[in-house]
Amino acid sequence: MFRIYGIGSVDSYSKMTLEIKKGQNINLMEFLRELVELQYKRNNIDFRRGMFRVTGDRVDVFPAQLEDIAWRISFFGDEVEDIKEFDPLTGEFIQSFEEVKIFANSHYITPKPRLENAIKEIKKDLKIRLEEFDKEKKLLEFQRLKERTNFDLEMIQATGTCSGIENYSRYLSGRQPGEPPPTLYEFIPENSLLIIDESHVSVPQINGMYKGDRSRKKTLSDYGFRLPSALDNRPLTFEEWNMMRPPTIFLSATPGLSLIHI
């Protein structure tokens, strides 16, 4: 399986982590605040990945990078007293740790300086687009885009995210218009091997994914549902994918000429 749809920047994601050590001095409320900044949500009832729950001086965290393991971090005053790994389904303790690293719950999480710059760029492009709609007498599109984008900006400023945050990924990753989006390829080692099964079916779909996505996003942009920059939240083109992919094995019982000549 290959991933050609854009995700957040590997540089931003790798920087947004929280390291907790046994014996570390940290206030409980400060720790919870940092979890929220990493897009974790508090839920004492439905405990799933990307969630945390609090009971007295004890915090259970279900790390985004793990599938079936959670961590229990116990505090004594302003000090981390204990860190234990447990099964969130049964509550059974597995082992203790001296330190753990908690990764962000979203690939679109962005350091504050870059986030502030992204907000400025979004406002700048919004102003340009609204002027275009005003000049073309498209009042409905004008109002729709203004309300939607300003609401998103308020949410981003308050919480660091919003519904559909991926549509602003170009600003968050600091890319120029038309640049390829960050993808899973940026997260894998350089010595990786890509294996594509049924490649005579899979590979031709790559261009189709890009064209279909662009057509849909252009409609959203034309009618004021999104800024034109949403078109840069896209899958890779075939040319970009072909240049970016690691060494690849194409598995096919009926390869066509186009596949043979890749």
Can you name each region flagged by the protein language model?
Residues 1-260:
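ASCE RecA-like P-loop NTPase motor cores
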